[in-house]
């Protein structure tokens, strides 16, 4: 792998800015999600909003027993660390964590299909939160999920769901 213009390039690796916790990460991840992964603008903004709320794009963010850009915990955290090590990344790297997230999204084909065709960034933020993040708010203080992909989860409240939705809309407006 080599560095060029603040980007890291390598076989099968995300091509994005090598800056942690910055607007550079937001913009580079947006480009990666739309151009490489094929997500729509709204779908990419929904993912970005969740990562922003979870960790402000900081791959070393710790909240209790949760870690990284998507605040993985328990088995998923172990899986992320093992994946990164086995694929030549530091588990603390933005690139490694994004690569793991995309790898793990293969287990969510309906969500990926939705993110590729989404036109509503707020709905994309909800679907990513309920489907991938699974950030259930047991206190009941979060907003209720009103999406369509996971009807059994409509009874659940999700942590900072309104904030995720508002951030997705803000990002969508700024990218449009």
Task: State where each predicted segment sits.
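Substrate-binding/active-site groove segments that recognize
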Residues: 64-82
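Non-catalytic cell-wall polysaccharide-engagement segments
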Residues: 1-23, 81-96, 102-176
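Functionally constrained cores in energy, signaling, and assembly domains
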Residues: 34, 61, 96
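Short alpha-helix boundary/capping elements
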Residues: 52-59, 76, 109, 136
């Amino acid at each position: 792998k080599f560095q060029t213009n603040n980007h890291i390039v390598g076989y099968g690796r995300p091509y994005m800015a090598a800056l942690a916790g910055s607007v550079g990460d937001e913009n580079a991840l947006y480009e990666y999600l739309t151009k490489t992964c094929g997500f729509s603008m709204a779908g990419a903004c929904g993912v970005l909003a969740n990562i922003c709320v979870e960790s402000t794009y900081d791959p070393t963010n710790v909240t209790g027993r949760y870690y990284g850009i998507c605040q993985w915990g328990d088995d998923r955290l172990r899986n992320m660390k093992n994946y990164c090590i086995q694929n030549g990344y530091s588990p603390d790297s933005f690139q490694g964590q994004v690569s793991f997230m995309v790898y793990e999204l293969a287990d969510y084909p309906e969500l990926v299909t939705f993110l590729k065709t989404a036109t509503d960034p707020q709905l994309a933020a909800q679907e990513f939160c309920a489907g991938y993040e699974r950030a259930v708010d047991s206190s009941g203080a979060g907003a209720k999920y009103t999406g369509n992909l996971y009807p059994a989860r409509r009874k659940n409240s999700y942590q900072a769901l309104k904030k995720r939705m508002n951030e997705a809309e803000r990002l969508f407006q700024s990218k449009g």
